[in-house]
């Protein structure tokens, strides 16, 4: 158990051993272990405990005198005090644990591996799927089913190594080397690849199978991706992790909750995030802690899992070098004090971080080229004949062995050194170091035989930690009940953190209930309310059933987090599932009572206590059952794209087979079974029986009736189905039996069946939650458009997780390639730049009088501590800010910047944002066509793109598809593309780059700097922020702008050869000397007191302002302004642009050129997204076929006409699913546009919004054809046109209405999402408006039956005209023939039935089936479909009017979408002041945090969206 998670803030005491001495003792112990065979686990743990006790006795705060859980406030053991020492705490905790006899024994877990081979199946490249070629995948599927497998890809080959308990292993290698796969293999996470059966892994006597099954949480893999619940605070997030792994017995007498809180506080203090305790974690869309802090939250959570074997995959990504060193220092302390084992893959490891590790593994394309002590690794390769350049770190030197572009060979060794991965591996296999390693592995395996004594002790320790109720073989610590309780607590915290969805859902349901109730207000207790009561109960049961539909989206959002916690063995996914169900119960209960209470009593449903409670109870049970239904769909599928189409068809089926839209007697025989598995059908029958059974309803309308029919008794009959001649009322039981086939005896039986459905679906949900995981990434393999690249099947290994190796093939670029970058002449300068933002009514200064310039042919680094405002300054200079107040002077050749400045500069953002479906060449071409000056011919722009591809060495993957992160281009290729997109625009002024090397390995970082160096040599002006680079990278910059906290300048000037000028400035002004081997970039942070643990008494900002260098900067700025202001030509080369007004426009391309290019790209995107198009097609075809064949050839009976009407009504349920498909797609498009393309002035917002609306129209046209054919003809609506010989015309008219319906749905989706941030909120808004449109369209209740207040809603509802048009086209001008149960029977007063009914028929219509009979007349009250149409206000004469009005709504949606987008999302310019007001810079804000703050303008936009 890792009792001491370690810390960033470890403050050693004067009598406490230093980290270095402790590390040396550890190495000494290792050497003894290697020389005297492998020490036993007990011996090693004994040594660790003895060392810890020795150090503890020397500590000022001895653990014998103080319990960490009862530490004195302000002491070194108090994590909430300012003097906290993580090392002192760890030793005190260990002593407390050792002194407690009831505490569980400590566990350690080393690992040996030999003959380790890992492989996968697939290709190094793949073809891009499109709407046209996806069918070719069927061929490959058939081959796979026939037993043919894809090509075997070797990922790791013949790996051997030994990492003992208490040791640290660093894994080095470029992307694609297999580092991620190796770490995953050690922890048993082998999804997507296979471990060879002959591979040997030994975890100190524990086998890999036992590790995965019984001890999963004892070996954890921490990926570089940060996934957390965004609306939970950091403190609660870490408390949960600590509580989930809390042992049964807590040493020191603390309770479990006290233990969890204490561990949380300790880990937060250790990693420097105590100040974020009450701040939500956030994510890319929800503002929370900064990116660096979120990374430390992820690290802290993993540490709290207390795993004895920890594998960290690039977990320092996003941290600067100082924090990366502290992270390694923390791991060092864990291993030495607690015996944990740490394996870390790290990029750009600083030398200080590398020195903390015991051993190093170097991988080269899956081959092991070295494994052994870190202190001997460098000499191993030097002995081969390689040279380590000055100031290159050991880690970078070892990694450079895997690149022929970077490794340097000693003179005379050119023909002796290895060159290929196989040659390096062969040299390793023949080495003395490998022979020693094999000997150590052999002794280790013999000492720790699998299934031996150590396994039993490991089990005993694990069992002592577990809850008593937990199974011995379970990997979890808490019992299942405890897991549920803990997850229930977190669910409550999540609900408190973000109650908006719950509140909005409850309010939405209450509003809908009020609206529906007002529509059916105070129904009469007579037969005139029969249809209305049925409609009301149908609507009520459907709303209750589908109120949980959005739970699918919630489950998919939390799925990655739950699966991560399951891998950490914190809890069963099913425990979280049960907790979420329990947490939803109060809301569902309250919602069921409030909504149904309003609906039940306002509408005058049966006002009896028993019936009311039965109605609420049935609705509540059905809500729970359908919640299980939606959760089951989400858990059984692996992605939302898979789930939505199936959910849509199932929702349609469940709705249709309730028994209301299609009565049981009208259900086709082949589909009647669907009603038996429809829980909604059972619920509807029960509440219909509950409402009608045992009641008598007075008759309102009799047949015959009128002035000539003053009759009674058996001579007239109530016109309602279920009536009896001569009876003045209709029994409710007769009505529901005749109309729906319902029986009162099935009322409670149906509730029991619904309960059974709930139990079955709940079981499916829980089992699937535990065993079905979400869809995994396929890996970063290149994807080409079919026909644009031949698959190369001869290449080497691929790292499933890490991607292909860097594709650079040439060390140098030809001078001809460099020459395509036109020489720049403009100089950009800035003076006294200040930037203020408003934070909680307080004006805060972020940048404080910053000066500088960037000249052509120079590479300037912008550096500073975290929170200094580096990215903020870059955004201000590049005119990317939309908030705050900017003051100062920013000039281009002595002149103010104009509207064209943004498009004339290139800005390569840190995030590599690109359209995933485009190829590299297309992305570059798009930028060139829209951002290069308009006067340049199109052919020249395209030719320029080809030259940029050559310059950036992207020829090999120029036609590859970008893909999404994790699939497609790897990190280096994406970074090259990001820079290429800016270069393709031919920036006339300069190039901004924000952290171009962040998260990259040293080789890739060097390659990026190579590229920047090429651009600089050809006259490109470059300003680049960079996170504390290595010494070799830092030397490549010409100038440095160095900021301290508060955005204040510390230094601006030349760097000098070997940083001599920079070093001289700081030493001359009181800084300590820079050691020869030190990294100047890290040294200068220590000098100004910005590095962890460093301090200075010198005010370096004040020193700069008083220095001669500052005076020179001011003088030179004035000189530049005076000289350059004489120049009037802002162009780089072409004099023809001197007086071209177009060169000063905001956008380079005219609007219609923008619109054409954007429209073309969006069309290509949809064509290359077959999942989107085919899911849309599947949704339309499946739903229409389902409806069509469920109502196959519906006859023109009274109920048949109702069925035909509901066939149209049911089709409208496509609406919600249709817009839910469009909205997420639009959100992804908008994110790219607003993050990269809008700030760079690539094209206007009008082109963006219009293109996204129009691109849906042709696909909707195709979908309308499919939907029409699969729906119109099966139902038999075409037969109604045969009487008037207008089959073709009526068919065409129906297709037009189907077409305009889909057009309306598409534009409505854009109308909803245009101003809102998330598809979920827009979906809620859309569903509410859709519900209102359906309620007021005239189907469920006619205009005559509506309260007069709602008549305006009937007239403004688009569906009113859609229903009127479709009903008239589908049903008009046809005869009606009643079914046997629909005829009304009565006796005539005298004469025949025909004579008796003649006057009534002339007045009301209908026909007599037996006109010549003199008794028992059979009368059908309707003989013409036009009579039915009049009841719903649908007339064929208004067909074209209704069609035209629908297009009015479509056009309105489109214009409303544009207007709302402009109103709520188009940014307004920040305030710019010539002179800055004197504001004290209080504290510092992380640049990430600053960018994430809400400005006054953004706040207004957010308020507009919220108000909307």
From Swiss-Prot:
Molecular function GO labels: ABC-type transporter activity; ATP binding; ATP hydrolysis activity
Chief place where the protein resides: membrane
Protein topology in the membrane: Multi-pass membrane protein
Residue ranges of every copy of the ABC transporter domain listed in the record: 136-390, 828-1070
Annotated glycan sites: 24, 35, 83, 231, 314, 1390
Pfam families reported for this sequence: ABC2_membrane, ABC2_membrane_7, ABC_tran, ABC_trans_N, PDR_CDR
Region (Disordered): 1-35, 54-82
Cellular component aspect of the GO annotation: plasma membrane
Keyword entries, A-Z: ATP-binding, Cell membrane, Glycoprotein, Membrane, Nucleotide-binding, Transmembrane, Transmembrane helix, Transport
InterPro entries, sorted: AAA+_ATPase, ABC2_TM, ABC_trans_N, ABC_transporter-like_ATP-bd, ABCG_dom, ABCG_PDR_1, ABCG_PDR_2, P-loop_NTPase
Similarity comment: family membership: Belongs to the ABC transporter superfamily. ABCG family. PDR (TC 3.A.1.205) subfamily.
Function description: ABC-type transporter; part of the gene cluster that mediates the biosynthesis of the sesterterpenes ophiobolins, fungal phytotoxins with potential anti-cancer activities. Acts as a specific transporter involved in ophiobolins secretion.
UniProt protein name: ABC-type transporter oblD
Naturally occurring in which organism (per UniProt): Cochliobolus heterostrophus (strain C5 / ATCC 48332 / race O) (Southern corn leaf blight fungus)
């Amino acid at each position: 158990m890792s009792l001491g998670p370690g810390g960033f803030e470890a403050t050693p005491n004067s009598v406490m051993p230093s980290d270095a001495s402790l590390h040396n003792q550890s190495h000494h112990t290792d050497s003894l272990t290697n020389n005297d065979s492998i020490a036993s686990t007990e011996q090693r743990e004994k040594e660790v405990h003895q060392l810890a006790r020795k150090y503890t006795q020397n500590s000022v705060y001895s653990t014998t005198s103080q319990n960490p859980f009862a530490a004195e406030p302000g002491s070194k053991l108090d994590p909430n005090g300012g003097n906290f020492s993580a090392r002192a705490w760890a030793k005190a905790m260990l002593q407390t644990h050792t002194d407690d006899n009831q505490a569980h024994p400590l566990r350690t877990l080393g690992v040996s591996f030999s003959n380790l081979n890992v492989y996968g199946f697939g290709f190094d490249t793949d073809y891009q799927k499109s709407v046209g070629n996806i069918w070719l995948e069927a061929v490959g599927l058939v081959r796979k089913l026939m037993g043919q497998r894809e090509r075997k890809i070797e990922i790791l080959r013949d790996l051997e190594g030994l990492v003992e308990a208490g040791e640290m292993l660093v894994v080095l290698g470029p992307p694609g080397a297999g580092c991620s796969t190796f770490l995953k293999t050690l922890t048993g996470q082998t999804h997507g690849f296979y471990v060879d059966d002959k591979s040997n892994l030994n975890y100190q006597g524990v086998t890999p199978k036992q590790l995965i099954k019984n001890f999963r949480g004892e070996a954890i893999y921490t990926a570089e991706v940060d996934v957390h619940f965004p609306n939970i605070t950091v403190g609660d997030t870490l408390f949960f992790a600590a509580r989930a792994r809390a042992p049964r017995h807590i040493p020191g007498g603390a309770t479990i909750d006290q233990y969890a809180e204490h561990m949380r506080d300790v880990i937060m203090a250790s990693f420097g995030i105590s100040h974020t305790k009450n701040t939500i974690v956030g994510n890319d869309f929800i503002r929370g802690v900064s990116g660096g802090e979120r990374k430390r939250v992820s690290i802290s959570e993993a540490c709290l899992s207390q795993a004895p074997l920890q594998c960290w995959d690039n977990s320092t990504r996003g941290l600067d070098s100082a924090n990366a060193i502290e992270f390694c220092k923390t791991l060092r302390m864990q291993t030495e004090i607690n015996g944990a084992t740490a394996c870390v893959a790290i990029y750009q490891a600083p030398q200080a971080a590398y020195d903390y590790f015991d051993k190093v593994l170097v991988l080269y394309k899956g081959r092991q080229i070295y494994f052994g002590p870190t202190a001997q690794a460098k000499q191993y390769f030097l002995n081969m004949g390689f040279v380590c350049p000055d100031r290159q770190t050991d880690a970078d030197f070892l990694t450079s062995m895997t690149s022929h572009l970077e490794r340097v060979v000693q003179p005379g060794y050119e023909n002796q050194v290895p060159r290929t991965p196989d040659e390096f591996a062969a040299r390793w296999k023949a080495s003395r170091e490998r022979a020693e390693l094999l000997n150590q592995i052999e002794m280790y395996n013999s000492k720790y035989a699998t299934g031996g004594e150590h396994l039993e002790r490991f089990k005993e320790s694990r069992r002592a930690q577990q809850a008593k109720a937990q199974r011995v073989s379970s990997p979890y610590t808490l019992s299942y009940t405890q897991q549920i309780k803990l997850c229930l607590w977190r669910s409550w915290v999540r609900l408190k953190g973000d109650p908006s969805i719950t509140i909005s859902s409850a309010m939405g349901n209450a509003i809908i209930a009020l609206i529906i109730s007002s529509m059916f207000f105070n129904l009469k207790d007579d037969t005139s309310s029969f249809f209305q009561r049925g409609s009301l109960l149908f609507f009520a049961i459907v709303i209750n059933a589908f109120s949980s539909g959005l739970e699918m989206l919630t489950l998919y959002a939390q799925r990655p987090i739950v699966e991560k916690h399951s891998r950490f063995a914190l809890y069963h996914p099913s425990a979280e599932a049960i907790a979420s169900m329990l947490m939803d119960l109060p809301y569902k209960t309250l919602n069921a009572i409030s909504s149904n209470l309003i609906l039940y009593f306002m509408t005058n449903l049966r006002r009896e206590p028993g019936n009311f409670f039965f109605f609420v109870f049935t609705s509540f049970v059905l809500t729970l059952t359908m919640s299980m239904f939606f959760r089951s769909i989400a858990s059984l599928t692996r992605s939302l794209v898979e789930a939505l189409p199936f959910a849509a068809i199932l929702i349609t089926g469940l709705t249709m087979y309730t028994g209301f839209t299609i009565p049981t007697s009208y259900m086709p025989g082949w589909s009647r079974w669907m009603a038996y598995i429809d829980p909604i059908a059972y619920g509807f029958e029960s509440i219909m029986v509950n409402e009608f059974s045992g009641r008598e309803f007075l008759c309102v309308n009799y047949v015959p009736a009128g002035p000539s029919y003053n009759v009674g008794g058996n001579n007239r009959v109530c016109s309602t189905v279920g009536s009896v001649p001569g009876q003045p009322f209709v029994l409710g039981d007769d009505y529901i039996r005749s109309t729906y086939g319902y029986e009162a005896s099935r009322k409670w039986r149906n509730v029991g069946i619904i309960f059974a459905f709930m139990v079955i679906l709940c079981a499916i949900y829980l089992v699937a939650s535990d065993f079905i995981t979400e869809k995994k990434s396929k890996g970063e393999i290149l994807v080409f458009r079919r026909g644009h690249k031949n698959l190369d099947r001869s290449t080497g290994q691929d790292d499933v997780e890490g991607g292909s190796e860097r594709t650079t093939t040439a060390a140098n670029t030809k001078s001809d390639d460099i020459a395509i970058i036109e020489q720049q002449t403009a100089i950009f300068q800035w003076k006294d730049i200040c930037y203020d933002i408003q934070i909680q009514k307080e004006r805060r200064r972020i940048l404080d009088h910053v000066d500088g310039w960037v000249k052509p042919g120079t590479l300037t680094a912008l550096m500073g501590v975290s929170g200094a405002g580096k990215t903020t300054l870059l955004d201000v200079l590049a005119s990317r800010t939309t908030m705050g107040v900017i003051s100062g002077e920013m000039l281009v050749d002595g002149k103010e910047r104009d509207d064209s400045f943004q498009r004339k500069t290139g800005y390569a953002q840190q995030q590599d944002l690109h359209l995933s479906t485009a190829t590299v060449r297309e992305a570059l071409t798009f930028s060139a066509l829209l951002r290069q000056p308009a006067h340049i011919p199109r052919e020249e722009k395209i030719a320029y793109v080809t030259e940029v591809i050559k310059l950036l060495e992207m020829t090999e993957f120029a036609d590859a598809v970008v893909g999404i992160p994790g699939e497609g281009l790897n990190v280096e290729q994406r970074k090259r593309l990001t820079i290429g997109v800016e270069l393709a625009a031919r920036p006339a002024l300069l190039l901004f780059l924000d952290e171009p090397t962040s998260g990259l390995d040293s080789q890739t970082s060097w390659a990026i700097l190579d590229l920047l160096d090429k651009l600089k040599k050809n006259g490109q002006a470059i300003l680049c922020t960079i996170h504390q680079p290595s010494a070799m990278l830092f030397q490549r910059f010409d100038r440095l702008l160095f900021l301290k906290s508060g955005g204040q300048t510390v230094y601006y000037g030349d760097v000098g050869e070997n940083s001599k000028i920079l070093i001289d400035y700081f030493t001359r002004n009181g800084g300590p000397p820079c050691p020869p081997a030190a990294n100047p970039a890290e040294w200068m942070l220590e000098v100004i007191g910005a590095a962890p643990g460093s301090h200075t008494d010198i005010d370096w900002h004040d020193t700069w302002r008083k220095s001669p260098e500052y005076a020179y900067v001011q003088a030179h700025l004035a000189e530049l302004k005076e000289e350059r202001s004489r120049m009037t030509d802002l162009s780089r080369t072409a004099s023809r642009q001197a007086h071209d007004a177009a060169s000063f426009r905001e956008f380079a391309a005219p609007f219609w050129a923008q619109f054409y290019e954007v429209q073309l790209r969006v069309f290509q995107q949809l064509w290359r997204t077959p999942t989107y198009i085919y899911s849309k097609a599947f949704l339309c075809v499946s739903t229409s076929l389902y409806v069509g064949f469920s109502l196959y050839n519906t006859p023109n009976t009274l109920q048949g006409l109702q069925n035909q009407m509901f066939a149209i009504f049911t089709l409208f349920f496509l609406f919600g699913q249709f817009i839910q498909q469009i909205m997420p797609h639009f959100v992804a498009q908008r994110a790219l546009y607003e993050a990269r393309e809008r700030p760079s002035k690539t094209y206007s917002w009008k082109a963006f919004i219009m293109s996204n609306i129009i691109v849906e129209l042709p696909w909707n046209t195709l979908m309308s054809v499919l939907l029409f054919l699969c729906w119109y003809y099966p139902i038999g609506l075409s037969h109604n046109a045969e009487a008037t010989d207008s089959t073709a015309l009526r068919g065409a008219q129906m297709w037009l209405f189907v077409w305009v319906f889909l057009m309306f749905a598409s534009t409505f989706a854009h109308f909803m999402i245009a101003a809102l941030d998330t598809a979920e909120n827009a979906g809620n808004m859309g569903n509410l408006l859709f519900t209102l449109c359906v309620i007021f369209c005239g189907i469920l209740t006619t205009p005559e039956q509506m309260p007069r207040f709602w008549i305006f809603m009937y007239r403004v509802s688009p569906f009113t005209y859609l229903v009127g048009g479709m009903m008239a086209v589908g049903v008009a001008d046809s005869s009606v023939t009643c079914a046997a149960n629909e005829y009304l029977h009565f006796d005539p007063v005298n004469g025949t039935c025909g004579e008796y009914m003649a006057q009534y028929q002339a007045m009301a219509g209908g026909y007599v089936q037996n006109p010549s009979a003199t008794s028992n007349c059979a009368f059908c009250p309707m003989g013409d479909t036009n009579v039915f149409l009049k009841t719903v206000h649908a007339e064929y004469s208004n067909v074209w009017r209704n069609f035209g009005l629908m297009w009015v709504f479509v056009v309105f949606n489109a214009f409303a979408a544009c207007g709302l987008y402009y109103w709520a999302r188009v940014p307004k310019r920040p305030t710019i002041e010539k002179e800055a007001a004197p504001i004290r810079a209080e504290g510092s804000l992380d640049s990430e945090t600053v960018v994430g703050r809400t400005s006054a303008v953004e706040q207004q936009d957010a308020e507009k969206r919220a108000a909307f």
